[in-house]
Amino acid sequence: MSKNNPQAFLRDVADIIDERGKTHGHWRENMEVTAKMWSLFLGHYLSRPITAEQAAVMMGLLKVSRMACRSVTEEHCEDFVGYGGLAGGLLRVKNQESLET
């Protein structure tokens, strides 16, 4: 099967998320800590804290801004898609937890 298709690209991104988990920690905990740090830093500007899924989306936006200022690279695209996957995963966890309560 060709590796030059969207499905192969997404499988590669899933592998990257797994690999980075070994060095950066679990994706859910990482985004929760990031959200808390951003909420503390932005404190008086915000009316409510940033959620973990919002932090993941904002990390994706960071990748978009890098692509807008420089060039689009495969790595930036992988990271952008990966952060979207983290946001989606966080929302699934949140939705499941709300169903259980």
Where are these regions (language model features)?
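Intrinsically disordered, low-complexity regulatory regions
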Residues: M1-T101
